[in-house]
């Protein structure tokens, strides 16, 4: 009957509206969530703590394992092995994750474009930055920024 059909349609419309609300809540939570990769900064290991401090101080420069090892007065192979052992990440993974976190912070300034953010965070090219960013967040920096609601 028409009444039954109308009831079924009304019920369906309500379900769709509820789902829309759920999606909106998830999106809002996602937007409000702290978009950063959790990176401990203290490891109770002098060499690794010093290496992390080196990253924090120099992430915006063109630096890597070699520069960190030279700065700390240890061999690259020793630092590489120890870093992986203590942090669970290799040096470059940690450095890139730190740079990505800094880039996400920089995105909140709508005056900065993605290329500027990439170079200011120590990435050699915007393309490399986008590739690494996508590996962490599953989307490009531009797509990510659009979700955050900042103008490109």
Question: What is the role of each PLM region?
Answer:
Residues 1-32:
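Hydrophobic, helix-rich cores of sensory/ligand-binding and other regulatory modules
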Residues 1, 15-21, 36, 40-43, ...:
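Basic, amphipathic alpha-helical hairpins
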Residues 8-15, 72, 120-121, 132:
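Generic recognition of well-ordered alpha-helical segments
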